[in-house]
Amino acid sequence: MSADYDITETLDVKGASCPMPVVKTKSAIDDLAEGEILEVLATDSGSMSDIDGWASGTAGVELVDQEEGDDVYKHYVRKTK
């Protein structure tokens, strides 16, 4: 699915546990321009619900997609404003 997205930056938070994937995602999103997409790579299964919940409750971001693969969880987050 990632081929459908023009990924601006990739954030590798593999090995980090809650709340660090969300904290680092927020920091990285703050540095992007409107419309740009951040790919987040995580190994914490909790990141699936954590990043979804954060994006749902945060103005200016949209969770475009999430993928679960070989021990890596991928999240695609767009900055909307």
From Swiss-Prot:
Sorted alphabetically, which Pfam families does this protein's record hold?
A: TusA (PF01206)
Q: Where are the transmembrane segments?
A: none
Q: Gene3D superfamilies attached here? A: TusA-like domain
Highest taxon of source = Archaea
The family database entries (CDD domains) matched by this protein are listed as:
SirA_YedF_YeeD (cd00291)
- What keywords are assigned to this protein? Plasmid
Q: Which residues form the active site?
A: 18 (cysteine persulfide intermediate)
Task: Please state which protein family the record places this protein in.
Answer: Belongs to the sulfur carrier protein TusA family.
Q: What is this protein called?
A: Putative sulfur carrier protein VNG_5061C/VNG_5236C/VNG_6059C/VNG_6467C
Organism this protein belongs to: Halobacterium salinarum (strain ATCC 700922 / JCM 11081 / NRC-1)
Question: Source organism lineage?
Answer: Archaea, Methanobacteriati, Methanobacteriota, Stenosarchaea group, Halobacteria
